[in-house]
Curated annotation (Swiss-Prot):
This is Putative RNA-directed RNA polymerase. It is an enzyme of class 2 (transferase). It holds the Pfam family RdRP_3. Keywords: Nucleotide-binding, Nucleotidyltransferase, RNA-directed RNA polymerase, Transferase, Viral RNA replication. GO terms for molecular function: nucleotide binding; RNA binding; RNA-directed RNA polymerase activity. Belongs to the luteoviruses RNA polymerase family.
Length: 867
């Protein structure tokens, strides 16, 4: 009974057990061998286990194989000579001849003829006897030589009374013979597995026909110098399977292999059948197959895909064989799987862009030496193999950031400056929008400075209280508007060349002037934008649940909708002096405050200094958005929405806008799609490089703020892309011990569960993190410190996780959005459900996780960061 437990154990556990018994418990070792012989041949699954055990017991080395071959040859010769002598003696004595002859015939393998009735001479007996003695002497000499070889290679204790030389060499020979048999069987299976599959190309068994769509078009033809108009039916090309038995057989093979190529784990359950049907539908739409062909392919695939072929069964047998498992375990040990799990560290990066050497930037020595390196930490088991890094706070990165993020827009060695807007274009085309916002907002009060200070966390709060006291004694002056910039320490997905970004804050004294007016009135101003557009437009004020419902409602307004994403490359850099003045006109129109008007005027000309390493950088720029200003987010939304409203008004189209600053999506009717081809040239007049992304015609394919709509239990919700798993597995925070790591995992998990309840894959990932943290409790302040600003926006204060079942409908919707089919979703979820994420701090730099991004259909060049 005890030995039977080993059948289900790992190969490593079995090998360790055998080694321990052989060295210390010989009686158990021999009992185990007898038990193996008893179960051998009774059950095929047990035979594989028996072979694996005997392989571990043998532990054969190369030198033994040569000795075993020679020993087998010599032993055969001795046995043949002995049996022949025995036969001759029997014939001489005329007793036991039949038995002796049978023994001789067997030992000589039937290769030597010896008559039954003959009487050998004494001389013949002596010759055969001498030959046997000579062979025995040679065998003895061989055994002496073999014993010395064993002593040299394996030490004196290896050959002993429990493991004599002859038994060992016979075992080696048997194992080698079995290995040869296995090699022949493997070659046979390999030939079957790697035989080419005869799959014809789709075009060989289908044909294209033109069919009438039922619609008519007006055709103008010239006849006798006059134009004649008449209606003709609109034709459409469709593809169908040829009406022959050969074509249908070829189509059956083709669709079966095509679906299996997409997903080889499909079986006969409800979800698999739905997945098969969707794959067939997608293939049919791609190749424009007619409904009859689609129906036939669906029927074939539903029957053939879930039934494994003999090749599928053999493939699974090979993959799950004891030898294959043992080899994988050995590789796991060599890869240190289990030993390198935990929180790893990656060093910061240096931007690959060259220094342009712009004269506008002055670099001086003498500053206090500052830290350069910027490490990032990541969970080795869940980062999906996605490489995230943070920029080093180096002089090179600082110069690249200033040159490429403030002054120039090119990616090469030449200085290419941002486009300038046409004269007075903002006031000429967007004056009406400015006035509409002012009217919609109405009166806004100025809030107490103490309230502004108390809205920040402890560290900033003290600095704001100090600034408030300072303003009481020294009035605001222009120097308060000077900017002290620094490199933004953020996670960059390293899929392309990156220029680090800058944060450009002004003094706390300056922020109090603007913050007491603008910060607490921002929502009111954003709702005014919604009122001008006639529907919710600025979606940053809504959580991902409400965002999804709003976007779905916008989509459903159109009979044949299309979504056009708008990519505003480096928006802050393109905000010109003219754009800033237009934005400031809204604030001044609302508040009519001279102190705020003066502070806003100081945003036009920016004096900036920056400390990095032991250097100080100074530069001056007119216009441009300073990313640390109180009005950065709100101002970008006002400018973008104003330009978009004017553009839609100019086109005269009905459209819906989804905006979150520089991130925009336009939803309109497909008939209007071509009207937006001139968007780049239009926005170039305003000084912006605006590029339209590829239009999408399915709601689930609409991407907004790195999220897509997914129908969860019948209600649309904005769900982050699967690569967010890799991003949430990295942190810029310092981690000193395992308790810090568990706190980080708990904070990320709690927020992730709120956003992703009922979402395939993501819910399991965050449950895995939360479980691995030991369900650790963390403070609200720590949660805000861990999660990014974007995640906090999506939450909108939510902290309660409402458990939601994952339905088949939700799985199909997630598939439409992210390309991960329902069966793959379940496989990934099972992986996370069985995973415990280690909180051990590791010193290694890079490890390859078990679950990688390719399984989640994450493209290698799909980055969250713009250049």
């Amino acid at each position: 009974m005890f030995f039977e437990i080993l059948i289900g154990a790992s190969a490593k556990a079995v090998k360790d057990f055998i080694s321990h018994c052989y060295s210390r418990l010989k009686s158990i070792y021999y009992s185990f061998k007898r038990w193996l012989m008893e179960i051998s041949g009774q059950f095929k699954a047990h035979d594989a286990f028996v072979n694996m055990c005997f392989g571990h017991m043998a532990d054969i080395e190369d030198f033994e194989a040569e000795l075993a071959e020679e020993f087998a040859e010599r032993e055969d010769e001795v046995e043949e000579a002995r049996s022949l002598l025995k036969l001759l003696v029997a014939q001489k004595s005329k007793s036991g001849v039949t038995e002796a002859w049978t023994d001789f015939f067997t030992k000589s393998r039937g290769g030597v003829y010896a008559p039954l009735s003959c009487e050998p001479t004494r001389q013949e007996l002596e010759v055969k006897s001498e030959k046997l003695e000579r062979l025995l002497e040679e065998q003895h000499q061989f055994e002496v030589r073999a014993a010395k070889k064993y002593i040299k290679e394996k030490g004196r204790g290896f050959i002993n009374c429990w493991n004599d030389l002859r038994s060992r060499l016979r075992l080696v020979k048997d194992v080698k013979d079995e290995a040869k048999d296995n090699a022949r069987a493997a070659a046979k299976i390999g030939a079957e597995m790697f035989a080419p599959v005869d799959v014809q190309d789709l075009y060989s068994f289908t044909e294209v026909k033109k069919v009438e769509t039922g619609l008519m078009k007006e055709v103008v033809k010239e006849k006798n110098g006059e134009e004649e108009k008449h209606l003709e039916p609109i034709m459409e090309e469709v593809r169908s399977i040829k009406d022959t038995a050969e074509a249908r057989d070829a189509a059956s093979t083709w669709i079966t292999e095509t679906v299996k190529l997409k997903n080889a784990t499909l079986n006969a359950d409800e979800l698999s059948l739905a997945t098969i049907a969707r794959y067939v539908e997608n293939v049919g739409d791609k190749f424009k197959l007619d409904i009859a062909s689609k129906t036939y392919l669906k029927q074939v695939a539903s029957m053939s895909v879930p039934i494994p072929t003999n090749k599928d069964i053999k493939l699974k047998m090979v993959l799950q064989s004891p030898e294959a498992r043992a080899r994988r375990e050995r590789m796991d040990v060599l890869d240190s799987v289990g030993f390198l799990e935990g929180l790893c560290t990656a060093s910061g990066f240096e931007s690959p862009f060259p220094i342009l050497g712009l004269p506008e930037i002055a670099v001086t020595d003498g500053a206090r030496l500052r830290k350069v390196s910027s490490n990032i930490r990541y969970l080795s088991q869940t980062h999906l193999g996605l490489v995230y890094k943070a920029p080093n706070a180096s002089l090179h990165n600082a110069l690249v950031a200033v040159e490429r993020r403030v002054f120039t827009v090119g990616k090469g060695d030449k200085a290419i400056y941002p486009p300038r807007p046409e004269h007075d274009i903002f006031t000429d085309t967007m004056d009406y929008f400015q006035k509409s916002i002012i009217e919609e907002v109405g009166y806004c009060k100025t809030y107490p400075a103490q309230l502004l200070a108390n809205s920040y966390s402890a560290g900033k709060r003290a600095m704001y209280h100090k600034a408030i006291a300072s303003l009481k004694t020294v009035p605001y002056h222009q120097k308060d508007a000077n900017v002290q910039a620094f490199l933004k320490k953020e996670k960059h997905w390293m899929t392309k060349d990156i220029a680090p970004r800058l944060i450009c804050p002004r003094s706390k004294r300056y922020n109090i002037i603007l913050g007491t007016r603008l910060k607490f009135n921002e929502k009111k101003i954003m709702h005014a934008i919604d009122s001008v557009f006639g529907s919710p437009t600025v979606l940053s004020g809504y959580d991902n649940f409400k965002q999804g419902r709003i976007i779905a409602k916008k989509w459903q307004k159109f009979a044949c909708p299309v979504a056009i994403g708008v990519d505003a490359s480096r928006f802050d850099q393109h905000v010109s002096e003219q754009a800033l003045k237009w934005e400031h006109g809204i604030y001044n129109g609302i508040f009519g405050d001279s102190e705020m008007a003066l502070a806003l005027e100081h945003q036009i000309t920016n004096n900036i200094k920056m400390f990095v390493e032991d250097k100080m950088l100074r530069f001056k720029v007119r216009g441009h958005r300073m990313s640390g200003d109180i009005n950065t987010s709100m101002g970008n939304k006002l400018i973008m929405c104003g330009m978009m409203h004017a553009y839609l008004k100019k086109l005269g189209v009905e459209a819906e806008l989804c905006n979150n600053g520089d991130d925009c999506v336009i939803i309109t009717d497909r008939a209007n799609e071509k009207l937006f081809d001139g968007m780049y040239d239009h926005f170039l007049q305003y000084g912006f490089n605006m590029v339209t992304e590829k239009p999408v015609y399915e709601l689930e394919q609409l991407e907004f703020c790195q999220s897509k709509p997914v129908s969860i239990n019948g209600k649309y919700r904005m769900v982050r892309r699967p690569d967010s798993i890799g991003k949430d597995s990295t942190t810029l925070l310092s981690m000193l011990n395992q308790s810090d790591v568990k706190s980080y995992m708990s904070a990320v998990a709690q927020c992730g569960l709120v956003l992703n309840a009922g979402v395939p894959i993501l819910e399991s990932f965050y449950k895995c993190l939360y479980r691995s943290s030991g369900y650790k409790k963390v403070s609200e302040e720590f949660i805000k410190n861990v999660i990014s600003y974007g995640t906090d926006e999506r939450l909108q204060g939510r902290r309660t996780y409402n458990e939601t079942p994952i339905t088949n409908h939700s799985r199909m919707s997630y598939w439409e959005s992210f390309g991960v089919d329902p069966k793959i979703q379940q496989i990934v979820e099972r992986y996370y459900d069985g995973l415990t994420v280690s909180a051990q701090l590791q010193s290694v730099k890079v490890t390859t996780p078990h679950l990688q991004s390719i399984l989640l259909s994450i493209p290698e060049n799909h980055s969250q960061n713009e250049y």
